[in-house]
């Protein structure tokens, strides 16, 4: 259960980078050396309210399916057992399909969801399509995301299509790193 639940919850938490979390920051406590904390949860759920947001859950499921895919690719590469490799390829196919569905939902949300933006006068406002605009305003990050996606898909598809091919992790892992870095950059830009 830990192998599925942990990536699901971590992905859900990362989804809050885009949707926000319910906590309050006490700016007066920042300069107070004796203050043990500067932020507190705004409710008694302590962040678990994130699972009530569909985008966060979609993001979490995407991360979970990706983790299972990468684990399958790693084991196919490192364990010399044809019977196990056949079972792992079946798991890889199912989980990659789940990953693609969740990725599509997340990308649709990226194009349409609102995000915090700052106008020329320094005023913060909610901008529709903010993360999509962030992506197209940073062509290097867009290229990084697309290259990562191509590497990931290449690793998975080659492993699924060629029974003798076992090195899909060597494409998928660097692709995952590039795509995830791009997603964090999209969240952090202005």
Label for each model-derived stretch:
Residues 2-165, 181:
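Long, contiguous internal "core" modules enriched in hydrophobic/ aromatic residues
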Residues 156-190:
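C-terminal hydrophobic structural anchor segments
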């Amino acid at each position: 259960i830990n192998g599925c639940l942990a990536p699901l919850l971590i992905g859900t938490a990362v989804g809050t980078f885009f949707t926000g979390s319910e906590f309050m920051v006490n700016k007066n406590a920042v300069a107070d050396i004796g203050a043990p904390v500067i932020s507190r949860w705004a409710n008694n759920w302590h962040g678990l309210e994130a699972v009530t947001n569909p985008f966060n859950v979609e993001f979490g499921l995407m991360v979970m399916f990706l983790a299972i895919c990468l684990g399958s690719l790693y084991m196919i590469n490192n364990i010399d057992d044809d019977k196990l490799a056949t079972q792992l390829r079946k798991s890889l196919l199912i989980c990659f399909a789940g990953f693609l569905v969740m990725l599509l939902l997340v990308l649709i949300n990226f194009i349409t969801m609102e995000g915090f933006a700052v106008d020329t006068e320094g005023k913060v406002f909610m901008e529709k399509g903010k993360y999509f605009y962030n992506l197209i305003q940073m062509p290097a990050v867009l290229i990084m995301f697309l290259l990562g996606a191509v590497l990931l898909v290449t690793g998975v598809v080659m492993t699924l299509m060629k029974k003798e091919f076992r090195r899909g992790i060597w494409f998928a892992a660097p692709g995952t790193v590039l795509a995830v870095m791009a997603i964090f950059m999209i969240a952090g830009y202005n």
